[in-house]
From Swiss-Prot:
Keyword Nucleotide-binding: yes
Compartment annotation: Cytoplasm
Catalysed reaction equations from the record: UMP + ATP = UDP + ADP
Summary of activators and inhibitors of this protein: Allosterically activated by GTP. Inhibited by UTP.
Organism annotation: Nitrosococcus oceani (strain ATCC 19707 / BCRC 17464 / JCM 30415 / NCIMB 11848 / C-107)
Homology family: Belongs to the UMP kinase family.
Subunit structure: Homohexamer.
Biological process (GO), any one: 'de novo' CTP biosynthetic process
NCBIfam families: pyrH_bact
Enzyme class: transferase
Protein name listed in UniProt: Uridylate kinase
Pfam families hit by this protein: AA_kinase (PF00696)
Domain of life: Bacteria
Amino acid sequence: MPLDGGKPKYRRILLKFSGEALIGEVGYGIDPKVVQQIALELQELNRIGIEIGLVVGGGNIFRGAGLAAVGMDRVTGDHMGMLATVMNALALQDALERLGVFCRVMSAIRINEVCEDYLRRRAIRHLEKGRLVIFAAGTGNPFFTTDTAASLRAIEIGAELLIKATKVDGVYSADPLVNSDAQFISRLSYDQVIERKLAVMDTTAIIMCRDHSLPLRVFDMHKVGALTHIIKGEDVGTLVSRE
């Protein structure tokens, strides 16, 4: 969806997708249709000059915390989860490059044959040159989620907004997919998210956003054009900020 002459409110953003967001209708792994739709939305933002960083989870392929609960060493499981995020990042890179979008995958762990090492200054330079940057392998450390990685990378690159893509159109008082009485919440403070234990992002990620005054927008990734509306400054989904 084009901006139709409207001026974008944000010039540099960090977008967070869960690995599960890529499953689509296939039940497991990566649905090419979902990846293509995400790539098309990002292509439009890239075309109008928005600098985009992207963090994707790996839960569609592997979830280390789940196997740790049944006996696997947690550090080993988390390392396997990091590799799953690299696989998702490469799939998104491929889809974007087929649309003509210059894209770089930067990994927090060294896999030089398939992607670049993450270096903050190099990542910012890629963004300034109009390249979309996908940050893979989380923070590179076990016990930290990709939500925390998204907050960290957003702060490091100086993003004006952190955007989290979900299956519902924002934050609710309870899971709307299982509770029909769940109420939509359009605005929250960081402290309200923490105090009410709302499932927005993990607590570490929210605290980082709060401490660095990084606004967070939660929206429904399945709504075509929603990202463009957010970039224009429209009130889409739920805004988490100091106010």
